[in-house]
Amino acid sequence: MRLPSRQQVLKMLATFSLALGLFAAKVQAHGGVIGYSWDGTWYEGWHPYNTPVGQTSIERPWATFDPIMDATASTVGCNNDGNPGPNQLTATVAAGTAITAYWNQVWPHPYGPMTTYLGKCPGSSCDGVNTNSLKWFKIDEAGLLSGTVGKGVWGSGKMIDQNNSWTTTIPSTVPSGAYMIRFETIALHSLPAQIYPECAQLTITGGGNRAPTSSELVSFPGGYSNSDPGLTVNLYTQEAMTDTTYIVPGPPLYGSGGNGGSPTTTPHTTTPITTSPPPTSTPGTIPQYGQCGGIGWTGGTGCVAPYQCKVINDYYSQCL
């Protein structure tokens, strides 16, 4: 029997790895932004699996933890149809303030970019405004931070390291007014790329006078296409193991003077936290993949045999 060539082996491995990524995408939980904080205040996000009756939030409603896998979908703006919630709130934030968004779980996808956009509403409030009608500009991005496309450190990996949170500073030059802020993570571990956007309603005060240029503005849908290089990259090819460049999808960063697809990244800091001791591995009733510990966790810590409670980060331990 003739042995396969090296090229054939590499191709088979790439195909197998991609298949594993596709399988993992189906069995792993996904999620979205479930809260925001700045200046010491917590703003509760939308809870997509709770009844909408009585929910009040600065975040626009969204219905599912599932990813958006069509970059031109009508929901790609804010993971919804663009409409506000029944009891929509607005939060006030000063230009120059750092806003932190928090995801619902230990994020399972460390390979992909993080982006943050602002979209200015036409009046004094975003109440009643459909977000699909807005023009958006990007104020933050972090793509491939170091290493290679196939084995490097990505913005989403840094988000995970920051306790599943991402902090973006509102530029001090942004004009005051009513805005939507859009936090987004894109997962590249399988194709099509998985897009996870959520939006919240703001009033920005104390701003500047630098409006975004026309080249910095995009619509959603419309800002991405399914053929964008930043959405079609294959992490499992031989080239990906040596390639050190990645083009973040979307327009150029606000104020950068670029032409879009910039690899520019923004430094981010992590808020110090108090760590909790590792949970015990006493046999119990928590099933595989269940939570068994973490800061603020008041449930059980014992996993069913043969699984053990493993620390994922300070806020989350899991039966594995």
UniProtKB/Swiss-Prot annotation:
<feature type="region of interest" description="Disordered">
    <location>
        <begin position="255"/>
        <end position="284"/>
    </location>
</feature>
<feature type="compositionally biased region" description="Low complexity">
    <location>
        <begin position="262"/>
        <end position="274"/>
    </location>
</feature>
<feature type="domain" description="CBM1">
    <location>
        <begin position="284"/>
        <end position="320"/>
    </location>
</feature>
<dbReference type="InterPro" id="IPR049892">
    <property type="entry name" value="AA9"/>
</dbReference>
<keyword id="KW-0119">Carbohydrate metabolism</keyword>
<dbReference type="InterPro" id="IPR000254">
    <property type="entry name" value="Cellulose-bd_dom_fun"/>
</dbReference>
<feature type="binding site">
    <location>
        <position position="194"/>
    </location>
    <ligand>
        <name>O2</name>
    </ligand>
</feature>
<dbReference type="GO" id="GO:0005576">
    <property type="term" value="C:extracellular region"/>
</dbReference>
<dbReference type="InterPro" id="IPR005103">
    <property type="entry name" value="AA9_LPMO"/>
</dbReference>
<keyword id="KW-1015">Disulfide bond</keyword>
<dbReference type="GO" id="GO:0030245">
    <property type="term" value="P:cellulose catabolic process"/>
</dbReference>
<feature type="disulfide bond">
    <location>
        <begin position="121"/>
        <end position="126"/>
    </location>
</feature>
<feature type="binding site">
    <location>
        <position position="196"/>
    </location>
    <ligand>
        <name>Cu(2+)</name>
    </ligand>
</feature>
<keyword id="KW-0964">Secreted</keyword>
<dbReference type="Pfam" id="PF03443">
    <property type="entry name" value="AA9"/>
</dbReference>
<dbReference type="InterPro" id="IPR035971">
    <property type="entry name" value="CBD_sf"/>
</dbReference>
<protein>
    <recommendedName>
        <fullName>AA9 family lytic polysaccharide monooxygenase-like protein CEL1</fullName>
        <ecNumber>1.14.99.56</ecNumber>
    </recommendedName>
</protein>
<feature type="signal peptide">
    <location>
        <begin position="1"/>
        <end position="29"/>
    </location>
</feature>
<dbReference type="GO" id="GO:0004497">
    <property type="term" value="F:monooxygenase activity"/>
</dbReference>
<dbReference type="GO" id="GO:0046872">
    <property type="term" value="F:metal ion binding"/>
</dbReference>
<dbReference type="GO" id="GO:0030248">
    <property type="term" value="F:cellulose binding"/>
</dbReference>
<comment type="similarity">
    <text>Belongs to the polysaccharide monooxygenase AA9 family.</text>
</comment>
<keyword id="KW-0732">Signal</keyword>
<feature type="binding site">
    <location>
        <position position="189"/>
    </location>
    <ligand>
        <name>O2</name>
    </ligand>
</feature>
<feature type="glycosylation site" description="N-linked (GlcNAc...) asparagine">
    <location>
        <position position="163"/>
    </location>
</feature>
<keyword id="KW-0325">Glycoprotein</keyword>
<keyword id="KW-0479">Metal-binding</keyword>
<feature type="binding site">
    <location>
        <position position="109"/>
    </location>
    <ligand>
        <name>Cu(2+)</name>
    </ligand>
</feature>
<feature type="disulfide bond">
    <location>
        <begin position="78"/>
        <end position="199"/>
    </location>
</feature>
<keyword id="KW-0186">Copper</keyword>
<keyword id="KW-0503">Monooxygenase</keyword>
<keyword id="KW-0624">Polysaccharide degradation</keyword>
<dbReference type="Pfam" id="PF00734">
    <property type="entry name" value="CBM_1"/>
</dbReference>
<comment type="function">
    <text>Lytic polysaccharide monooxygenase (LPMO)-like protein that binds strongly to cellulose. Seems not to acts as an endoglucanase, a ceUobiohydrolase able to hydrolyze fluorogenic cellobiosides, a /3-glucosidase, a xylanase, nor a cellobiose:quinone oxidoreductase.</text>
</comment>
<keyword id="KW-0560">Oxidoreductase</keyword>
<keyword id="KW-0136">Cellulose degradation</keyword>
